[in-house]
Amino acid sequence: MNNNHVYDMLVVGGGPGGYTAALYAARAGLDTVVLEKLSAGGQMALTEQIDNYPGFEDGIDGFSLAEKMQKQAERFGVRSEYAEVLRMDLTAVPKLLETSEGIFRGKTVVLATGADPRTLGVAGETELLGRGVAYCAACDGMFYKGKTVVVVGGGNSAAADALLLSRVAKKVILVHRRDTLRATKIYHEPLAQAENVEFRWNSVVSALLSGDRLTGVRLRDTVTGEESVVDCDGVFVSVGRQPATALAAGQLSLDKGGYIVAGETTETSVPGVYAIGDVRTKPLRQVVTAVSDGAAAVHMAEVYLAEAGR
């Protein structure tokens, strides 16, 4: 590897946003590399079935879609490197990324590092992913049409997920560790009026029950310690997300949740650095919105490079 080589664009993260940015950059003639620590696709690659991404009338699994996105970008000359970014200097000229595979330098940086859903931390949770355990109601809700589901959480995301699921599921059981929702008041009345939404206050999930698939949950009362079993077909874990922004802290503006502050232009507080997909502040985190961000970031990077004469 030539550590002195300067790329036009360094893309950190090989999810749908990252590879879309790389595709657009390569087609614009920008020398581009994608740095991914695991495998292409990010969280999308773990999704068993994606039915809300345009162009696939029968849906597609996340791994296959990720593979297609990577191959499409590489067809136009994008380089993929499997490397973990260990340190970033985003104000250096050129910008510098220290990785497990060496130093990378670039004129611009696109951060597509994503956000991981916070988990319940109970046994079997990982094994039941896609077999009854889900983290995205907008993605997987339709698989539970006419069924009974549990939503875990008490914030805005949990309330919104419960409302969305109440339109398709036979019954929604909202489980929260406190005796009232943390969600903003706008959600309280619609949830209270929904005839198929039931609340389990002062409760946490202590165990997942399953055969080949999830069959129910065991709840523990946080006040009395008593346990009970709830039969259900699915559990939606809506206890927040953890954005992968540790390396950006102190260099970029972050909101109180740790997300990189960036609007629809994807521009961050440092010129030439762009945040796309789940890692940035935004109202909706989906594959299609990450892809849109990737295209926008390249457009803004082209403007930046032209104005800077780079």
What is each stretch, according to the model?
Residues 73-93, 97-98, 103-104, 166-263, ...:
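A Rossmann-like FAD-binding core segment of flavoenzymes
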Residues 3, 7-76, 159-184, 255:
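Beta1-alpha1 glycine-rich phosphate/pyrophosphate-binding loop at the start
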